[in-house]
């Protein structure tokens, strides 16, 4: 009286790979290019020479550049801005934060770890060093300086 309808769905994109070499050959061919992302649709934010010099000053770098180096920096910065604009245009409604696999570090864990450290002669850690042993004149655990500090 009741009939159960079962239908198997299948689809094909291409032929099945016959060997590992075919798979490797397929994976060698790029399917997309990052240069397509760098083609700017927006030119509203563009780095010009005064902005470049200001960025160099803020970074503590020299602003004395030859024309070729300056042009290269401008092209690189504009490409980065274009890429950032493209990334910001992507709408991301859902995202999941990746859970961390570790527990938070506690002060007691740090104390325990430092308590287990041993000195290594390979690193030049040879034991206790008392700088007062090197002083020719000392008094009550302090260096004694016999020079005048001011100019005469």
Curated annotation (Swiss-Prot):
| Annotated localization | Mitochondrion inner membrane
Task: Tell me its EC number(s), please.
Answer: 6.3.5.-
> What's in the keyword line of the UniProt record?
ATP-binding, Ligase, Membrane, Mitochondrion, Mitochondrion inner membrane, Nucleotide-binding, Protein biosynthesis
Q: What class of enzyme is it?
A: ligase
What's any GO biological process attached to this entry?
Answer: mitochondrial translation
Which InterPro entries does the entry mention? GatF (IPR027499)
One GO cellular component, as annotated? glutamyl-tRNA(Gln) amidotransferase complex
Q: Please give, as recorded in its UniProt entry, the membrane topology of this protein.
A: Peripheral membrane protein
Instruction: Please list the GO terms describing molecular function.
Output: ATP binding; glutaminyl-tRNA synthase (glutamine-hydrolyzing) activity
Where is it mainly found?
A: mitochondrion
Q: Which family does it belong to?
A: Belongs to the GatF family.
Its quaternary structure?
A: Subunit of the heterotrimeric GatFAB amidotransferase (AdT) complex, composed of A, B and F subunits.
Q: What does this protein do?
A: Allows the formation of correctly charged Gln-tRNA(Gln) through the transamidation of misacylated Glu-tRNA(Gln) in the mitochondria. The reaction takes place in the presence of glutamine and ATP through an activated gamma-phospho-Glu-tRNA(Gln). Required for proper protein synthesis within the mitochondrion.
Q: What is this protein identified as?
A: Glutamyl-tRNA(Gln) amidotransferase subunit F, mitochondrial
Origin species: Komagataella phaffii (strain GS115 / ATCC 20864)
């Amino acid at each position: 009286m009741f009939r159960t309808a079962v239908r198997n769905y299948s689809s094909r994109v291409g032929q099945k790979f016959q060997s590992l070499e075919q798979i490797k050959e397929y994976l060698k061919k790029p399917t997309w290019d990052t240069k397509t992302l760098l083609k700017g649709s927006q030119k509203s934010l563009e780095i010009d020479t005064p902005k470049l010099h200001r960025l160099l000053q803020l970074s503590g770098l020299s602003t004395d550049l030859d024309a070729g180096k300056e042009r290269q920096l401008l092209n690189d910065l504009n490409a980065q801005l274009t890429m950032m604009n493209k990334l910001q245009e992507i709408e991301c409604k859902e995202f999941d934060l990746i859970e961390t696999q570790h527990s938070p570090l506690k002060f007691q864990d740090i104390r325990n770890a430092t308590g287990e450290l041993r000195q290594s002669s390979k690193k030049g850690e040879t034991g206790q060093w008392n700088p007062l042993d090197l002083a020719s004149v000392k008094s009550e655990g302090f260096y004694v300086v016999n020079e005048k500090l001011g100019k005469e």
